[in-house]
């Protein structure tokens, strides 16, 4: 079916395509609005006409005598005699737009159709020059999407908008301009950007014109020269110091983000030499030149929105607490310098040295275990806990009709009749809750949980085992659940009598007052049963139950996450304990290895290879040296020069009575182990020959038995030298 477009006939076409139950629901919803707008009352009358209830529609249209569009509807669709002719009123397009807005709120038409209706209304009012065009524009701005927000021709002049300005309490010193209509005779509508014959680049040739309704809000702080495209020299500008607590208005001609990056990258203290205006142009560099502004009307901004602050602003504030700031306003880069502008906008802002800390190596598990703050953070949940309104698509119904499988048509009729009698938002078990593929008992529980009243449709078919279980389940739920008392209502329809019911069903429900459709006061009983206060109380109870269920699910998920974190923490603690045990074992092995080195024979040494470091005498941890570095200028080893006399020195034995002999141990007892190289001890030798540097010494002689003992007690050879040779002890 073709869409007739946004008109009264199109609105009637939308209503005519709806189902009857949907129209009935919309009729009750619009009729319950006591203080509704004129358009909602007109839409209510149109719904009555779509339902075929012409009498009620005429009564509703009669109450809208002052509405010209309502009179047009009454003349064309309700066959009512009106004083006015069938011509269309001037505000017809606006009323049609409001009607489509109500239909879009009920999801009866797409939002694009509503926007099209407002576009037609804006075009009509603009062509007529109606004084209500501004009010219509504001309404379209609030209700429509961003596609048509603006002038109907596609452009809109600049004007002061009170909604975009901050309240006067934010900055009492700032002046405001009063809004006024555009009265400039030479004002022209805006047009798209287009290239000109100028050789200047587009980036430096863009200009911002002055608004005809908004005057300059602040004065200039310095002398702004013309553009660099002109040949006139620029005047010297000195950066003005601003207190830290104040905020100075900045120009719009330079993007705030780029200006912030330049201020971070340049030094904080910049001295500008004072020169004459004639020498300012050739002396001043491009980086310190004053920013170029438009020749026509430079516009300054007096306030900065707190919501539109870039991330660099917070970084600058944190750095400003550590660095002394001498100037709140950094030197600006001229717009005409394309190369410097591209470099500045593309390069990231320079960070202060305090923020560029060198990365550190991660701590070892032992050091991490010593500080509680270094434990790993608990893993974040991959499935975040959402609100119940986002996870559940169930809605609340004022009543639900529980019925047998053979009574679906009767249940639908009962629901429509109850809605006609003023009980909105009803449902049937087969229509809303009996989802294919789901368990029957689960569907029954959902129907009871998500409804205020449970209506049991008593027919001859309602006598099977499943129906009896439904009765028992509904009764037990009303008795055990808080706030569910008197919520189970047996209903006897016109299609059945009490004699046709099963004895079991009658026995279970004999203690409850029934709702009999055969009764002449059936409508009054329905009104007394389903009161607005009761329905509202049931809705509040349902919301609380859903919130409690959501909180319970969240608590279960959080408990599972807590157990997961506890398991990870226990595993980490066990790992730390095993690491400490392994480290203690390594320490023991190191001590034993050091002892074995101290008990071994000395190894010869040569230049560039140091002796192995023995362990500590008390059994401490051995310290292993690093590998020696090769010397830059190796020196040959120094050997002792032989004596000048040809005969080797004699070895006189000390007398037996000498007190020094008591300090040497006996030959039978082993020498004590000391750290370092051990002395060379020779026993029972008659001749000893030593050779150093191709020289040989010898000593022979017979010794008495007493001398032999004395010789065994006195060591003949001393400890090894640094070159690994035995040291000969000579008498003094």
Curated annotation (Swiss-Prot):
<dbReference type="GO" id="GO:0035591">
    <property type="term" value="F:signaling adaptor activity"/>
</dbReference>
<dbReference type="GO" id="GO:0006809">
    <property type="term" value="P:nitric oxide biosynthetic process"/>
</dbReference>
<feature type="modified residue" description="Phosphoserine">
    <location>
        <position position="209"/>
    </location>
</feature>
<comment type="function">
    <text>Involved in innate immunity against invading pathogens. Adapter used by TLR3, TLR4 (through TICAM2) and TLR5 to mediate NF-kappa-B and interferon-regulatory factor (IRF) activation, and to induce apoptosis. Ligand binding to these receptors results in TRIF recruitment through its TIR domain. Distinct protein-interaction motifs allow recruitment of the effector proteins TBK1, TRAF6 and RIPK1, which in turn, lead to the activation of transcription factors IRF3 and IRF7, NF-kappa-B and FADD respectively.</text>
</comment>
<feature type="compositionally biased region" description="Low complexity">
    <location>
        <begin position="658"/>
        <end position="671"/>
    </location>
</feature>
<dbReference type="GO" id="GO:0002735">
    <property type="term" value="P:positive regulation of myeloid dendritic cell cytokine production"/>
</dbReference>
<dbReference type="InterPro" id="IPR017278">
    <property type="entry name" value="TICAM1"/>
</dbReference>
<dbReference type="GO" id="GO:0043254">
    <property type="term" value="P:regulation of protein-containing complex assembly"/>
</dbReference>
<dbReference type="InterPro" id="IPR000157">
    <property type="entry name" value="TIR_dom"/>
</dbReference>
<keyword id="KW-0496">Mitochondrion</keyword>
<dbReference type="GO" id="GO:0005739">
    <property type="term" value="C:mitochondrion"/>
</dbReference>
<dbReference type="GO" id="GO:0031398">
    <property type="term" value="P:positive regulation of protein ubiquitination"/>
</dbReference>
<keyword id="KW-0395">Inflammatory response</keyword>
<dbReference type="GO" id="GO:0032816">
    <property type="term" value="P:positive regulation of natural killer cell activation"/>
</dbReference>
<feature type="short sequence motif" description="TRAF6-binding">
    <location>
        <begin position="84"/>
        <end position="91"/>
    </location>
</feature>
<dbReference type="InterPro" id="IPR035897">
    <property type="entry name" value="Toll_tir_struct_dom_sf"/>
</dbReference>
<dbReference type="GO" id="GO:1900017">
    <property type="term" value="P:positive regulation of cytokine production involved in inflammatory response"/>
</dbReference>
<dbReference type="GO" id="GO:0035666">
    <property type="term" value="P:TRIF-dependent toll-like receptor signaling pathway"/>
</dbReference>
<feature type="short sequence motif" description="pLxIS motif">
    <location>
        <begin position="206"/>
        <end position="209"/>
    </location>
</feature>
<feature type="short sequence motif" description="TRAF6-binding">
    <location>
        <begin position="247"/>
        <end position="254"/>
    </location>
</feature>
<feature type="compositionally biased region" description="Low complexity">
    <location>
        <begin position="345"/>
        <end position="359"/>
    </location>
</feature>
<dbReference type="GO" id="GO:0010008">
    <property type="term" value="C:endosome membrane"/>
</dbReference>
<feature type="compositionally biased region" description="Pro residues">
    <location>
        <begin position="604"/>
        <end position="615"/>
    </location>
</feature>
<dbReference type="GO" id="GO:0043123">
    <property type="term" value="P:positive regulation of canonical NF-kappaB signal transduction"/>
</dbReference>
<dbReference type="GO" id="GO:0032728">
    <property type="term" value="P:positive regulation of interferon-beta production"/>
</dbReference>
<dbReference type="GO" id="GO:0032481">
    <property type="term" value="P:positive regulation of type I interferon production"/>
</dbReference>
<comment type="subunit">
    <text>Homodimer. Found in a multi-helicase-TICAM1 complex at least composed of DHX36, DDX1, DDX21 and TICAM1; this complex exists in resting cells with or without poly(I:C) RNA ligand stimulation. Interacts (via TIR domain) with DDX21 (via C-terminus). Interacts (via TIR domain) with DHX36 (via C-terminus). Interacts with AZI2 and IRF7. Interacts (when phosphorylated) with IRF3; following activation and phosphorylation on the pLxIS motif by TBK1, recruits IRF3. Interacts with TICAM2 in TLR4 recruitment. Interaction with PIAS4 inhibits the TICAM1-induced NF-kappa-B, IRF and IFNB1 activation.</text>
</comment>
<feature type="region of interest" description="Disordered">
    <location>
        <begin position="603"/>
        <end position="679"/>
    </location>
</feature>
<keyword id="KW-0968">Cytoplasmic vesicle</keyword>
<dbReference type="GO" id="GO:0140052">
    <property type="term" value="P:cellular response to oxidised low-density lipoprotein particle stimulus"/>
</dbReference>
<dbReference type="InterPro" id="IPR046946">
    <property type="entry name" value="TCAM1/2"/>
</dbReference>
<dbReference type="GO" id="GO:0032755">
    <property type="term" value="P:positive regulation of interleukin-6 production"/>
</dbReference>
<feature type="region of interest" description="TRIF-NTD">
    <location>
        <begin position="1"/>
        <end position="153"/>
    </location>
</feature>
<keyword id="KW-0053">Apoptosis</keyword>
<dbReference type="GO" id="GO:0050871">
    <property type="term" value="P:positive regulation of B cell activation"/>
</dbReference>
<feature type="region of interest" description="Disordered">
    <location>
        <begin position="305"/>
        <end position="389"/>
    </location>
</feature>
<dbReference type="GO" id="GO:0032760">
    <property type="term" value="P:positive regulation of tumor necrosis factor production"/>
</dbReference>
<dbReference type="GO" id="GO:0071222">
    <property type="term" value="P:cellular response to lipopolysaccharide"/>
</dbReference>
<feature type="short sequence motif" description="TRAF6-binding">
    <location>
        <begin position="296"/>
        <end position="306"/>
    </location>
</feature>
<dbReference type="GO" id="GO:0034142">
    <property type="term" value="P:toll-like receptor 4 signaling pathway"/>
</dbReference>
<dbReference type="GO" id="GO:0002756">
    <property type="term" value="P:MyD88-independent toll-like receptor signaling pathway"/>
</dbReference>
<dbReference type="GO" id="GO:0005769">
    <property type="term" value="C:early endosome"/>
</dbReference>
């Amino acid at each position: 079916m073709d869409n007739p477009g946004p008109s009264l006939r199109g609105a009637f076409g939308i209503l005519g395509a709806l189902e009857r139950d949907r129209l009935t629901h919309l009729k009750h919803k619009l009729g319950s609005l006591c203080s509704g707008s004129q358009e909602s009352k007109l839409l209510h009358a149109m719904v009555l006409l779509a339902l075929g209830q012409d009498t009620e529609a005429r009564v509703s249209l009669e109450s809208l005598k002052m509405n010209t569009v309502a009179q047009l509807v009454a003349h064309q669709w309700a066959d009512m005699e009106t004083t006015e002719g069938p011509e269309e009123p001037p505000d017809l397009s606006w009323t049609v737009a409001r009607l489509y807005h109500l239909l879009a709120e009920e999801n009866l038409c797409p939002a694009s159709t509503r926007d099209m209706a407002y576009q037609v209304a804006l075009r009509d009012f603009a062509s007529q020059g109606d004084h209500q065009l501004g009010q219509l524009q504001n309404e379209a701005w609030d209700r429509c999407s961003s596609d048509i927000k603006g002038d109907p021709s596609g452009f809109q002049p600049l004007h002061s908008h009170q909604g975009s300005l901050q309240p006067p309490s934010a900055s009492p010193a700032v002046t405001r301009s009063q809004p006024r209509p555009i009265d400039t005779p030479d004002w022209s509508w805006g047009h798209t950007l287009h290239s000109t014959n100028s050789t200047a680049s587009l980036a430096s040739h863009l200009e911002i014109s002055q608004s005809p309704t908004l005057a300059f809000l602040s004065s200039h702080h310095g002398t702004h020269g013309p553009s660099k495209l002109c040949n006139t020299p620029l005047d010297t500008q000195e950066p003005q110091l601003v207190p830290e607590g104040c905020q100075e208005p900045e120009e719009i001609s330079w993007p705030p983000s780029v200006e912030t990056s330049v201020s971070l990258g340049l030094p904080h203290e910049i001295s500008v030499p004072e020169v004459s205006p004639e020498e300012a142009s050739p002396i001043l560099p491009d980086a310190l030149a004053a920013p170029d502004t438009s020749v026509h009307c430079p516009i300054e901004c007096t306030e900065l929105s707190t919501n539109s602050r870039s991330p660099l602003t917070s970084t600058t504030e944190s750095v400003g607490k550590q660095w002394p700031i001498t100037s709140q306003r950094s030197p600006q880069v001229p717009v005409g310098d394309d190369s410097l502008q591209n470099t500045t906008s593309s390069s990231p802002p320079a960070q202060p040295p305090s923020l560029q800390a060198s990365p550190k190596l991660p701590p070892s598990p032992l050091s991490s275990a010593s500080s509680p703050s270094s434990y790993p953070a608990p893993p974040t949940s991959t499935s975040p806990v959402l609100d119940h309104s986002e996870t559940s698509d169930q809605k609340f119904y004022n009543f639900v009709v529980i019925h047998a499988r053979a009574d679906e048509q009767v249940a639908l009729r009962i629901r429509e009749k109850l809605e006609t009698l003023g009980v909105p938002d009803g449902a049937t078990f087969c229509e809303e809750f009996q989802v294919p593929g789901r368990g029957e008992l689960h569907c029954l529980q959902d129907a009871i949980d998500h409804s205020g009243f449970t209506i049991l449709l008593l027919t001859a078919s309602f006598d099977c085992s499943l129906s009896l279980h439904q009765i028992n389940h509904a009764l037990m739920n009303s008795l055990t659940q808080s706030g569910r008392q008197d919520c189970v209502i047996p209903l006897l329809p016109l299609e059945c009598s009490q004699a046709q019911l099963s004895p079991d069903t009658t026995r279970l429900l004999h203690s409850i007052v029934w709702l009999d459709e055969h009764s002449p006061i059936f409508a009054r009983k329905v009104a007394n049963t389903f009161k607005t206060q009761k329905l509202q109380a049931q809705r509040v109870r349902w919301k609380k139950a859903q919130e409690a269920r959501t909180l319970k699910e969240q608590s279960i998920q959080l408990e599972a996450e807590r157990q997961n974190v506890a398991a990870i923490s226990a595993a980490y603690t066990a790992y730390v304990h095993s690491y400490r045990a392994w480290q203690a074992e390594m320490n023991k092995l190191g001590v034993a290895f050091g002892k074995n080195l101290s008990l071994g024979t000395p190894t010869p040494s040569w230049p560039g290879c140091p002796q192995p470091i023995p362990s500590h005498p008390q059994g401490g941890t051995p310290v292993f040296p690093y590998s020696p570095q090769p010397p830059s200028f190796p020196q040959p080893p120094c050997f002792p020069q032989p004596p000048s006399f040809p005969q080797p020195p004699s070895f006189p034995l000390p007398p037996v009575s000498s007190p020094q002999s008591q300090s040497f141990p006996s030959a039978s007892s082993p020498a004590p182990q000391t750290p370092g190289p051990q002395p060379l001890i020779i026993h029972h030798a008659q001749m000893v020959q030593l050779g150093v540097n191709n020289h040989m010494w010898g000593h022979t002689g017979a010794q008495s038995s007493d001398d032999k003992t004395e010789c065994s007690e006195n060591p003949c050879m001393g400890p090894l030298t640094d070159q690994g040779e035995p040291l000969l002890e000579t008498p003094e």
